Amino acid sequence: MMRRRSSLLLALAVVLLALPAPAGAADATPAPAPTAAPAPSAAEAAFLAKIMRDLPMRYPTAQSAIKAGYVRYTNEDETGAISYVNTKAWNTTDPDVPAQLWYDVKGRLIGADFSVRRDADATPAPKPERPSILGIDPKRTITIGAHVHFVTCDKTTGKCVYGKAVGAKKYAAIGDVEHPTADGLVKTGAVKDAASVTAVFLYPAIYDVPVWVVPNPLGQFADKNPNVVPSPHAGKGEDDPM
C-alpha cells in the first residue's frame, strides 16, 4: 500500500532527535488520533461488501496470491501491510483482481489497492481530474509517482531484500523503463550482481484507492486500521525514490 513511507522523513526524524529538546518539549501533546474516513455511499458500500467477502476467499494466504500472479515487493509498512503486486492489473477493471494485495506478518489478507495508470510511458504525468475507480468517489483517489521496484535474494542464505527501488527517470536514462531488467539495475548502480535480482518491474504513475479488507472502525478507506497491529519492525527498510 503505497500512500506512505519516506526515507527522507525518517532521516529528518533522526536529525531532530539528535538536537537538544526545546523547553516544554516534555509537555508536548501526543500525536492526534487517526482520522476516520467519510462514510461510504451506497455504491461504495456495495463494493466494500463484495471485496470484504470475496477477496479473503480468493486470496486467503500470501501463497495463494503468489499462485495467482502476485509478487511480494515490500517489507511491512507502518500500517502493518506487506504488499504484493500484480503488474497486469495496474488498470484495475475487476474488483476480484486488485492491483495490489496486503498481508500482515501472520499472513492474513488485510487490504488491497485498486488503480488506474496516469500515463502511458512513465513520464511525469499530468494531473487532470481524478477518476472514479470501480465507482469509488474520486475524492478518495490518491496519486503515486512512477518508479522501478526490485527484489534481491542471496543464493547462499536464501534471504531476500524487499522495498528497494530507483526513480523512473534514473532508470529511463539507461534503458526502457516500461520493461526494466536486472542488467539495467546494474547500469543504474542499484545492484552489483544481476543474478541476485529475483523481481524487477515498473511501478507506473497511477491513481490509486487503498482499501482495508478487514473491518476497520475508522472506515475501510481510512489510512490506518486499529484492528491491524503492526510488528515492532514495521515501517523500516523501505526506499522512497519519488
Predicted regions located by residue number:
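Bacterial N-terminal signal peptides that target proteins for export
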Residues: M1-L9
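Bacterial N-terminal signal peptides
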Residues: L10-L19
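Hydrophobic alpha-helix-in-membranes signature
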Residues: L19-A21, V209
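Boundary at the C-terminal end of the N-terminal hydrophobic targeting segment
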Residues: A23-A28
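Primary mode marks residue(s) on the alpha4-beta5-alpha5 output face of response regulator receiver
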Residues: P30-M242
